[in-house]
From Swiss-Prot:
The keyword Aminoacyl-tRNA synthetase does not apply. Homodecamer; each decamer is made up of two conformers of VP2, called VP2A and VP2B. Interacts with a VP1-VP3 complex. Interacts with the intermediate capsid protein VP6. Interacts with NSP5. Interacts (via N-terminus) with NSP2. It comes from the Viruses. This is Inner capsid protein VP2. It comes from Rotavirus A (strain RVA/Human/United States/P/1974/G3P1A[8]). Inner capsid protein that self-assembles to form an icosahedral capsid with a T=2 symmetry, which consists of 120 copies of VP2, with channels at each of its five-fold vertices. This capsid constitutes the innermost concentric layer of the viral mature particle. It encapsidates the polymerase VP1, the capping enzyme VP3 and the genomic dsRNA, thereby defining the core. Its main location: virion. Belongs to the rotavirus VP2 family. Residues 1-54 are annotated as: Disordered. Residues 9-26 have a biased composition (Basic and acidic residues).
């Protein structure tokens, strides 16, 4: 590239390029010859590399001419900008290091999840009533079963019985009670908050006048029965007449339905205990938080009247039922983290147009500090890290941390006096509780030993670790100056005031902070400190401190405005919080750089920034949805725990119940929650009362367990064990089977009692005396219709092992079915062989399907509309932000 320095003209460039190319090829050839003599083994490789190099140089010379001129211009421009961007780059580096440290710290917390995923999960929690019910709730369905003759051959006729829709037992577990617990859990998930039959009604295909039935399953059942050849004519005529009956004056409609009596009881209960309530404008008006309704900065309007059919479901906003802030450090940390991330997303941004120009402010600060005449390194640090991004980050962090009650930790350099002076403002306006104790002590100690004690010529404070008093509390007793002691007294007593507003515990700020008057108190203390002689320190040290105080005191008006702005935004967003704001120090903390506090203090302008009404409504809706879902999931968990207790599954299922509860809250990483907190959560949950609807549903299941067992193809109601083989009996539902339909003449033992007492002696004695014994209780069975396996495997051995090991819960008898559908039926028939078994399965006949008994008329409202987002009816706007009014009827920002 040396030819450029000799002033090559643009038109001569192609010729120059050719000549240079030739020279370079010659030179490179010489080099290759030398290398060949030195290193013969690598000759080919070296040639290839050099030829590639020559080609690449040729391309660079041809194409790079004008690019280099452009790059030179860019270098000149960037050299001018580098000095401006240097502070921003340093800040970015600091931020990166901070994020890395934060991630490392968070990985030690069991329930941590990435920020974006938590925010998405919170916003995705929607009221369950938003999904419409398109079918009635059903456990049973009618099914056609064949009829077998006395010799085991299938007839052409069929018979209808009620069978289970989902006949599934828990995998790998032979306890039927788990089936009922899972069934109850499924009902709780599917239990509708309201039913509108008009939404699910479908056309009855066999109707004479296009009538409708209640849902698609009823229609398909009617269709199957209508087409069955054995159906009576009167039933077909009845199906043809099935249709809805409307009573428009009462807003009522009746629909015909085909339901098992138990399913009918469930759906009748759902219809009679709907959670929907009438909705009108007054309810929507009262739904908006009162402080936002009364805020003069927001204009709210409702332009439409709601119809009489409007309905809504009142959110379940009960408070502190589990007290997760008390002794649930890991869970509480996750809740506060998710609340913090949500709050940060709604705190308004301080954009560059709302802040003072960073460049102009740094220039002004340099003039105030007389930096051109400086010889002291410490004062150049005053300007480090000041930028608009840091100011905005600090503003959002402070408000979001207070809204979520997240503990903050302070990061600072002791030699940066400007940071410490900004920290004095921070400690003045933010209550002490918000900071990690160790971090607060370190910051206070730095302020005392760097600024306060040197000003009065006092010796350095030697603070003892673990001292119940903070450095400021010790200093308050030792400093004689009234203004400084008064300021220290305010900070030492700066706590949140707990106030219950609209039934929610709020953490409110001191009135002196809300109106900004405390800043005058801070300035008086700072002025007193700057007037002191610093007798034990050099003159340069005194000058540095005084100039730092001067920089802050020059912005007295802006600091008052900033404090008022901070308080207003905090209180306005706090009105949208629905869960009690419990204050407990969190396991992890939010890092706050004191340089970012300096940025905020120095760059705050006179523009008022308040949350938009849409942001407030969004924040309120997310909080309501999470809180309501939280309470509903508590109700579910309490109901399941009670059910497990009554089904004698209490010890077995407890941890999985609590895990399911946490999973349904969406924000927890359940596998990483410590076991001690799981069991503590179980203890809290079991102390709560069961919600009425959930208790009634469980009682319905409990009363009808026998009917459900009868309808299952996998659950037996007992087993009969004999020492000698018993013949298989004929049954018209199955053919030849080892089924007993009643227990007449058998000695009976309850399986529950057997499991509880563990006394197997009675069974053994009865079997040895050749007396069959019936073990009564629900247990699963398997079906095996192969005669070969029947010969090969005597099922008595199954029970011999169980009696030996004393494990009734592994009992799983085999049901043998031999009929014309079986593979080996003709083998049995031809040889006239009568199969036998040492066991019989006790099972009652499932309930026959009777059309007349299964036809029910269900009644619901003809029509209503459920609205889940009540705030969508409210149109909202803000007044001119510059005139925004605070609680004391004065402008938030007075400094113009």
């Amino acid at each position: 590239m040396a030819y450029r320095k000799r002033g090559v003209k643009r038109e001569d460039l192609p010729q120059q390029n050719e000549r240079l190319q030739e020279k370079e090829i010659e030179n490179n050839t010489d080099v290759t010859m030398e290398n060949k003599d030195k290193n013969k083994n690598k000759n080919n490789n070296r040639k290839q590399q050099l030829s590639d190099k020559v080609l690449s140089q040729k391309e660079e010379i041809i194409t790079d001419v004008q690019d280099d001129i452009k790059i030179a211009d860019e270098v000149k421009k960037s050299s001018k900008e580098e000095s401006k961007q240097l502070l921003e780059i340093l800040k970015t580096k600091e931020d990166h290091q901070k994020e890395v440290q934060y991630e490392i710290l968070q990985k030690t917390i069991p329930t941590f999840e990435p920020k974006e995923s938590i925010l998405k999960k919170l916003e995705d929690i929607r009221p369950e009533q938003a999904k419409k019910q398109m079918k009635l709730f059903r456990i049973f369905e009618p099914r056609q079963l064949p009829i077998y003759r006395a010799n085991g051959e299938k007839e052409l006729r069929n018979r209808w019985y009620w069978k289970l829709k989902k006949d599934t037992l828990p995998d790998g577990d032979y306890d039927v009670r788990e089936y009922f617990l899972n069934l109850y859990d499924q009902i709780l998930i599917e239990m509708p908050d309201y039913l509108l039959l008009k939404d699910m009604a479908v056309e009855n295909k066999n109707s004479r006048d296009a009538g409708k039935v209640v849902d698609s399953e009823t229609a398909s059942i009617c269709d199957a029965i209508f087409q069955d050849e054995e159906t009576e004519g009167v039933i077909r005529r009845f199906i043809a007449d099935m249709r809805q009956q409307v009573q428009a004056d009462r807003n009522i409609v009746n629909y015909p339905s085909i339901l098992h009596p138990i399913d009918h009881a469930f759906n009748e209960y759902f219809l009679n205990h709907q959670l929907v309530e009438p909705l009108n404008n007054e309810i929507i008006f009262n739904y908006i938080p009162e402080r936002i309704r009364n805020d003069v900065n927001y204009i709210l309007n409702m332009d439409m009247n709601l119809p009489s059919t409007a309905r809504y479901i009142r959110p379940n906003l009960l408070q502190d039922r589990l007290n997760l802030h008390d002794n649930f450090e890991s869970l509480w940390d996750t809740i506060t983290t998710s609340n913090y991330i949500l709050a940060r997303s709604v705190v308004p941004d301080l954009k560059e147009k709302e802040l003072v120009s960073t460049e102009a402010q740094i220039q002004k600060m340099s003039q105030d500090l007389q930096l051109e005449a400086l010889t002291i390194q410490s004062e150049t640090q005053f300007l480090a890290g000041i930028n608009s991004q840091a100011a905005n980050d600090c503003f959002k962090t402070l408000i979001a941390a207070m809204l979520s009650q997240r503990t903050m930790s302070l990061d600072f350099v002791t030699t940066n006096y400007m940071s410490l002076i900004s920290g004095m403002w921070l400690l003045t306006v933010i209550p002490n509780d918000m900071f990690l104790r160790e971090s607060l002590v370190a910051c206070e100690l730095a302020i005392i030993n760097t600024i306060v004690y040197p000003a009065f010529g006092m010796q350095r404070m030697h603070y003892r670790n673990g001292d119940p008093q903070t450095p400021f509390q010790i200093a308050e007793q030792q400093i004689q100056n009234f203004q400084v002691a008064n300021w220290l007294h305010f900070i030492n007593n700066n706590r949140f005031r707990q106030v219950v507003i609209d039934g929610v515990l709020n953490q409110t700020l001191n009135d002196n902070i809300r109106n900004g008057q405390v800043i005058n108190q801070l300035m008086e203390a700072l002025m007193q400190l700057s007037r002191q002689q610093f007798p034990t320190m050099p003159v340069d040290y005194k000058r540095s401190i005084q100039r730092g105080i001067l920089l802050l005191s020059n912005r007295l008006g802006q600091l008052v405005d900033l404090t008022r702005l901070l308080s207003y935004n905090y209180e306005t967003l706090m009105a949208c919080i629905t869960m009690n704001m419990q204050h407990v120090q969190t396991l992890t903390t939010e890092k706050l750089q004191l340089t970012s506090v300096t940025s905020l203090c120095m760059l705050i302008g006179n523009t008022t920034v308040i949350p938009s009404p849409q942001t407030l409504f969004h924040y309120y809706n997310v909080n309501v949805n999470f809180h309501s879902n939280y309470n509903e999931r508590i109700n579910d968990a309490v109901a399941i725990i009670t059910a497990a207790n009554r089904l004698n599954l209490y010890q077995k299922k407890m941890k999985s119940i609590v895990e399911d509860f946490l999973k349904r809250l969406q924000i927890f990483d359940v596998p990483r929650v410590p076991d001690d907190q799981m069991y503590r959560l179980r203890d809290r949950l079991r102390l709560l009362p069961v919600e009425r609807r959930r208790l009634d549903i469980f009682n319905l299941i409990l009363m009808n367990m026998e009917q459900i067992e009868r309808a299952s193809d996998k659950i037996a109601q007992g087993v009969i064990i004999a020492y000698r083989d018993m013949q298989l009996e004929r049954d018209e539902m199955y053919g030849f089977v080892n089924i007993a339909r009643n227990l007449d003449g058998y000695q009976q033992i309850n399986l529950e009692e057997l499991m509880r007492t563990g006394d197997y002696g009675q069974i053994t004695n009865m079997l040895l005396n050749n007396q069959p014994v019936a073990l009564v209780g629900a247990l699963p069975f398997v079906t095996d219709s192969s005669v070969i396996s029947l010969i090969a495997k005597l099922d008595a051995t199954v029970f011999a092992q169980i009696v030996k090991l004393r494990k009734v819960d592994t009992l799983k008898p085999i049901l043998y079915k031999i009929n014309s559908d079986s593979n080996d039926f003709y083998l049995v028939a031809n040889y006239d062989w009568i199969p036998t078994s040492t066991t019989k399965v006790y099972k009652q006949v499932p309930q026959p399907f009777d059309f007349r008994a299964s036809m029910h008329m269900l009644t619901s409202n003809l029509t209503f509309t459920v609205y889940s987002d009540l705030l969508s009816f409210v149109s909202a706007d803000t007044v001119e932000p510059i005139n925004a009014i605070a609680f004391d009827n004065m402008r938030i920002m007075n400094e113009l």
